[in-house]
C-alpha cells in the first residue's frame, strides 16, 4: 500500500471503500465513519447499494431463484445502475449540505465492476460511465482486496446471501482491470478486521494532518491522531458489489 503523504491538500470530504462481496468493506466503512467522528472529524456512513439483495428476496417470493431471473440480465443491470446512482447522489448531497466527511460503502467503480462481472457490453458500460461522470472522484478510494476463495468462505459463514466462486473471481478481475485501478489504495483485506482498520487509519492520518485539525477540538490537539476502537466482527454486507 502507498503510504499517506502530507502536503497542501484540501480537507478530507469523501472516502470510498470498494471491493468484491465478502471483502469486509461494509464493516470497514462503518468503523471508519465512527473512528473519524470520535477523532473530531464528523463523518457519515453511506450505503450505496444497488438493490440486488432486496430484489433477490422479492424474486424469491415470486418463485424466481434470483433478481436476474426475475428481470433478466439487462433489466437487472439497468435497475442496479439507477438505484446506485441515486444512492451516491443522495450521499454526496448530504455531505455537501452537512459538511461531514462522506464515507462511501461502494461507489461508481463498484457499478463498473458489476457490469463487467455480469457480462455487460462495452456500450452499456459507456452509457453508465456517462451517467456517473457527474460524480466527483473520491479523494481516497480504498480497494479491499481479498482472495475470492476466502471471500466465498466469509459469505457462506454469514449465511445471509450467496455468491458463486465463479462470480467472485470475475468481480475480482473486473476491479483489477478497471482504468481507475492505478488510483486505488489497495488494502490486503485477507487479514483481521483490526489489522485492516489500522492500515486504513495509517493512510488517512496524512490526509487529516494536511487538511486541518479536528473540528471542534482545541488547537493544541494532535491533528492526525485517530483512536481506533476495537471493531466488531464482520458485519454482513448489505448488498452485492
Residue positions per predicted region:
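P-loop (Walker A) phosphate-binding loop of NTP-binding proteins
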Residues: 20
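Hydrophobic anchor at the beta1->P-loop junction of P-loop NTPases
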Residues: 17
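Hydrophobic positions on the alpha1 helix immediately C-terminal to the Walker A/P-loop
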Residues: 28
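Conserved lysine of the Walker
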Residues: 25
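A glycine- and Lys/Arg-enriched "phosphate-lid" helix/loop adjacent to the NTP-binding pocket
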Residues: 106-174
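Extreme N-terminal, non-catalytic leader segments
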Residues: 1-14
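NTP-dependent small-molecule kinase module
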Residues: 5, 149-241
Amino acid at each position: 500500500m502507498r503510504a499517506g503523504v502530507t502536503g497542501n491538500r484540501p480537507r478530507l470530504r469523501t472516502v470510498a471503500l470498494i471491493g468484491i462481496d465478502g471483502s469486509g468493506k461494509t464493516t470497514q466503512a462503518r468503523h471508519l465513519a465512527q473512528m473519524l467522528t470520535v477523532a473530531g472529524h464528523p463523518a457519515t456512513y453511506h450505503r450505496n447499494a444497488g438493490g440486488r439483495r432486496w430484489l433477490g428476496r422479492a424474486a424469491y417470493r415470486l418463485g424466481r431463484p434470483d433478481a436476474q431471473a426475475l428481470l433478466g440480465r439487462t433489466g437487472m443491470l439497468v435497475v442496479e445502475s439507477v438505484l446506485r446512482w441515486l444512492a451516491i447522489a443522495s450521499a454526496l448531497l448530504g455531505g455537501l449540505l452537512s459538511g461531514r466527511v462522506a464515507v462511501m460503502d461502494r461507489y461508481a467503480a463498484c457499478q463498473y465492476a458489476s457490469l463487467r462481472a455480469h457480462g455487460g457490453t462495452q456500450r452499456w458500460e459507456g452509457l453508465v460511465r456517462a451517467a456517473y461522470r457527474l460524480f466527483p472522484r473520491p479523494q481516497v478510494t480504498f480497494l479491499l482486496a481479498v482472495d475470492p476463495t476466502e471471500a466465498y468462505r466469509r459469505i457462506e459463514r454469514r449465511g445471509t446471501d450467496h455468491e458463486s466462486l465463479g462470480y467472485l473471481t470475475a468481480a475480482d478481475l473486473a476491479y483489477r482491470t478497471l482504468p481507475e485501478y492505478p488510483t486505488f489504495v489497495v488494502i490486503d483485506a485477507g487479514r483481521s478486521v483490526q489489522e485492516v482498520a489500522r492500515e486504513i487509519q495509517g493512510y488517512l492520518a496524512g490526509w487529516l494532518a494536511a487538511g486541518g485539525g479536528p473540528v471542534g477540538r482545541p488547537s493544541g490537539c494532535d491533528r492526525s491522531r485517530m483512536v481506533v476502537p476495537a471493531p466488531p466482527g464482520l458485519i454482513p454486507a448489505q448488498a452485492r458489489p
